[in-house]
Amino acid sequence: EELIDEMKEKRGVTQDTELTADDLKELAEQFKAEYKEKIGSDFPSDPKEQLMGAVKAVFRSWDNPRANVYRRMNEIPYSWGTAVNVQMMAFGNMGDDCGTGVAFTRSPSTGEKKLFGEFLTNAQGEDVVAGIRTPMPISQMAEKFPEAFKQFQEVCNLLESHYHDMQDMEFTVENGKLYMLQTRNGKRTPAAALK
């Protein structure tokens, strides 16, 4: 992130999407140089090697101090281990028919059975929560991506029915097509939990 922020400052822009192709090429070279400095070897050019490196990094993270403290605090046995899901990348930042968002199947404040969340067009997931741009309410997704929104509503109903609990979800729309990235039981107020 620091290298990206430095490049944006150097170019006098505030958003990643304002960087040119040449800026991104320059950034890629900077990332490769930083990788070599920290790891001691060149960044692998083979995609399979890159993927396996990422998978191994997740498994190694199981033993980092923060993870150990978290497991102790939440009484999670070390023997459970961790898993790695590998899935195709969905790009929410390829144009105006793309986007990303986070949403709950219900209001986390009141428990009302109504979608609650935010989304951004032409953005990646972290952009929604980073505060770089102002997200739109999830209700406006119906206007921007009507087919994807209809499918999203169906998926939300299916997930809540399956898990018997309010869901907190992350999603991406790429070229008008919906991709569900993650779901988990949502946190809410005690009053909302009663609904």
Model-identified regions with their sequence ranges:
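Nucleotide/phosphate-binding sheet-loop regions of phosphoryl- and nucleotidyl-transfer enzymes
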Residues: E1-K195
